[in-house]
Amino acid sequence: MTIMRKTHPLMKMVNHAFIDLPTPANISGWWNFGSLLGLCLIIQIASGLFLAMHYTPDTLTAFSSVAHICRDVNYGWLIRYMHANGASLFFICLYLHIGRGIYYGSYXYLETWNIGIILLFLTMATAFMGYVLPWGQMSFWGATVITNLLSAIPYIGTDLVEWIWGGFSVDKATLNRFFAFHFILPFIIAAMAMVHLLFLHETGSNNPLGIPSDCDKIPFHPYYTTKDFLGIVLLLAFFFTMVLFFPDLLGDPDNYSPANPLNTPPHIKPEWYFLFAYAILRSIPNKLGGVIALIMSILVLALLPHIQTSKQRSLMFRPISQFLFWLLVADVLVLTWIGGQPVEPPFIIIGQIASLLYFTIILALMPIAGIIENKMLKW
């Protein structure tokens, strides 16, 4: 008799994806972040569902409903801080996952990579709208500033902004629709993640060497289920240390003041995970130019498969490209720091240099390094 997991229509899908899946024998801990992102999404959907039971998307009561969750709901403080820090954890895993993809050349799987970029945009949109919901000072002013960027679009910009606001300023209609979108988007993300996985399993996983591994595959279970479980345990240990001991470490103190349209905070800035893009936006004096640079800072990832010049897929044996990769990582960290600083010297010029370097490394230096390394192979 055939094993049930190989014949039952539902279990067969799970079996092909998580049990009998042929996996390269040499993939490292950097391949754990896919499953960790799945865990983060589950944590966010579960905690968000319980928060939505007590939250009211109304400008008069939103802030106090969040306070009520923290003070009066059983373990409400825990659910709220799990959701807030879960977003940070999500982006930490997301950026590490993307970094792994760049380092080991995983972008050569076009469909998987492009769906990953769509997932990144969806996650960023979800996180932005979620940040608006507590209706603190930074929620209100962040929503005002970021939605206002759309007014830079020629001809239709102003109408578009008012259409998104549902009025002439960020108000009750805006909060209500942001709550609706923030609720539905994670489920769309979950569906897209399934498609992401579907395309990945069409080609099979990449590996650190960046070479075909068809001759050396092992079943996903028990080898990588065990490995993923270790990653999950370590991630949860780190996560609950954050939630229980340092819940406000990554938050903004301004968001503990209720939203006040008459009082602007001294420094309007988004959450830490958007600061690098915010720094790129601010480094260009022109509004439309800034918005284009902001979008391109993420969209530039879609160009990677088309500007690869090296004969080798992975950076494992490419010292020049490795140096440029770590320079890019350092540059993104500098941009993150600059995004949180006020717009004044010397931060302005540092931000402009870092923004220029970001695009130069990806669009010019890395392809040139690939050509040089190809020549080195012949020496």
Swiss-Prot record:
Origin: domain of life: Eukaryota
Cofactor(s) essential for the protein: heme b
Where mainly located? mitochondrion
Q: List the disulfide bonds.
A: none
UniProt keyword terms in alphabetical order: Electron transport, Heme, Iron, Membrane, Metal-binding, Mitochondrion, Mitochondrion inner membrane, Respiratory chain, Transmembrane, Transmembrane helix, Transport, Ubiquinone
Q: How cofactor binds (record note)?
A: Binds 2 heme b groups non-covalently.
Q: Where in the cell is it found?
A: Mitochondrion inner membrane
Q: Which Gene3D superfamilies match?
A: Cytochrome Bc1 Complex, Chain C
A Gene Ontology biological process annotation? mitochondrial electron transport, ubiquinol to cytochrome c
**Outcome recorded upon mutating A67T:** In strain: Isolate LVT 2035
Residues annotated as binding a ubiquinone: H201
Which molecular-function annotations from GO does this UniProt entry contain?
metal ion binding; ubiquinol-cytochrome-c reductase activity
UniProt effect for mutating I295V: In strain: Isolate LVT 2035
Question: Sorted alphabetically, which CDD domains does this protein's record hold?
Answer: cytochrome_b_C (cd00290), Cytochrome_b_N (cd00284)
Q: How does it sit in the membrane?
A: Multi-pass membrane protein
Residues that span the membrane, as ranges? 33-53, 77-98, 113-133, 178-198, 226-246, 288-308, 320-340, 347-367
List, alphabetically, the GO terms of the cellular component aspect. mitochondrial inner membrane; respiratory chain complex III
The residues that the entry says bind heme b b566 are: H97, H196
Additional facts recorded: Heme 1 (or BL or b562) is low-potential and absorbs at about 562 nm, and heme 2 (or BH or b566) is high-potential and absorbs at about 566 nm.
* UniProt family annotation: Belongs to the cytochrome b family.
Please give the subunit comment from the record. The cytochrome bc1 complex contains 11 subunits: 3 respiratory subunits (MT-CYB, CYC1 and UQCRFS1), 2 core proteins (UQCRC1 and UQCRC2) and 6 low-molecular weight proteins (UQCRH/QCR6, UQCRB/QCR7, UQCRQ/QCR8, UQCR10/QCR9, UQCR11/QCR10 and a cleavage product of UQCRFS1). This cytochrome bc1 complex then forms a dimer.
Protein's recorded name: Cytochrome b
